[in-house]
Amino acid sequence: MPSMTDTTRSLRDCLAPAKLNLFLHITGRRPDGYHALQSVFQLLDWGDRLHFTLRDDGKVSRVTDVPGVPEESDLVVRAASLLKAHAGATLGVDIEIDKRLPMGAGLGGGSSDAATTLLALNRLWRLDLPRTTLQSLAVKLGADVPFFVFGKNAFAEGIGEALQAVELPARWFLVVTPRVHVPTAAIFSEKSLTRDSKPITITDFLAQRGIDAGWPDSFGRNDMQPVVTSKYAEVAKVVEWFYNLTPARMTGSGASVFAAFKSKADAEAAQAKLPAGWNSAVAESMSEHPLFAFAS
C-alpha cells in the first residue's frame, strides 16, 4: 500500500500496475471507428510508481520529465484535470512519476498511470466518488483506463470498458520487451488484421480453464500478434525464442511477449537463458489493484 503522511498532504509510492492480455480477440469494427474486442486482463505486481503532493493553488503539475511526453498531453495530467473539473475540486496536485514500464509495449503503462491518478486523487482530494463515476471518466482517457479503475482481473468486451471480474490462478510471468515501439493505432488500421473473430462468453473461457494447464497457447490467441510479428522482426524473434522453451503470447498490440510459470524460480530460470541485452522482467500476478479501496 502507498504511504500517506500524517497531515494527509501526500500519497507516496502508488503502484500503477502493468497488465497482460491473456488473449485478445477482435470481433468487429464499430461505426465510431473503434474495434470491438474480447480479452481477459491480468494485473501484475510490476509497474510505474507515482507520488502525489497537494497544492493549495489549485494547479495540476507533473514535476517529473517524461521524455517524449509533453506535460499537457500526459495521461496523468489529463486524468487529474478531468477529475478536478468533474468534482469541482479546489486543491491542486504535484505528480511525480517513477517510470519503470516501457512505453509502446502493450503493458498499459500510460493507462495505468491515469487510473492510479484517478484513484489516488479520489482519496487525497477527499472526493469519495464511486468507482462507477471514476470509470465513466476513465473511458474518456483511453480504452484500457477503465480496467485499471475497475481494479480486478477481468473479462473485457466492447472497446475494453465492459468488464466482469474473473478469478485467475496465481502465476509468475516472464515478460520480454523488444527495443521497438509498436504504435497501436497503426496496427489497428492494418488491412490484414483479423476483425471477425467469433465472439465467446466468459463461460467459454472459464470452462476450458486454459490458464490451468498448457496455457497460454490452449485458449484463444492475440489477433494482433500475426500483424505485429510480420512488421517487426524484433517481436517475431522474441516469440520464436519463447516457443523453443515454453508457450508464449504477445500482450496488447505489443511489443511485449510473455510466458506463464508456476513459480518465481521457474520464471527466473527461463529469464537466465535469455540472450544478453534483452529487456525483461519477472512479475507476479495480482488479484486486485493496490488502490482498490480508494473507491467504493
From Swiss-Prot:
This enzyme's EC code(s): 2.7.1.148
Keyword Disulfide bond carried by entry: no
One GO process term, biological-process aspect: isopentenyl diphosphate biosynthetic process, methylerythritol 4-phosphate pathway
Sorted UniProt keywords: ATP-binding, Isoprene biosynthesis, Kinase, Nucleotide-binding, Transferase
Residues given in the record as ATP binding sites: P102, M103, G104, A105, G106, L107, G108, G109, G110, S111, S112
Active site: K19, D144
Top-level EC class: transferase
Disulfide topology: none
Pathway(s) the chain acts in: Isoprenoid biosynthesis; isopentenyl diphosphate biosynthesis via DXP pathway; isopentenyl diphosphate from 1-deoxy-D-xylulose 5-phosphate: step 3/6
Molecular function as annotated in GO: 4-(cytidine 5'-diphospho)-2-C-methyl-D-erythritol kinase activity; ATP binding
Top-rank taxon: Bacteria
Reaction(s) catalysed by this chain's protein: 4-CDP-2-C-methyl-D-erythritol + ATP = 4-CDP-2-C-methyl-D-erythritol 2-phosphate + ADP + H(+)
Alphabetized NCBIfam families for the sequence: ispE, PRK14608.1
Record family assignment: Belongs to the GHMP kinase family. IspE subfamily.
Function text: Catalyzes the phosphorylation of the position 2 hydroxy group of 4-diphosphocytidyl-2C-methyl-D-erythritol.
Protein name stated in the entry: 4-diphosphocytidyl-2-C-methyl-D-erythritol kinase
Species annotation: Burkholderia mallei (strain ATCC 23344)
Gene coding for it: ispE
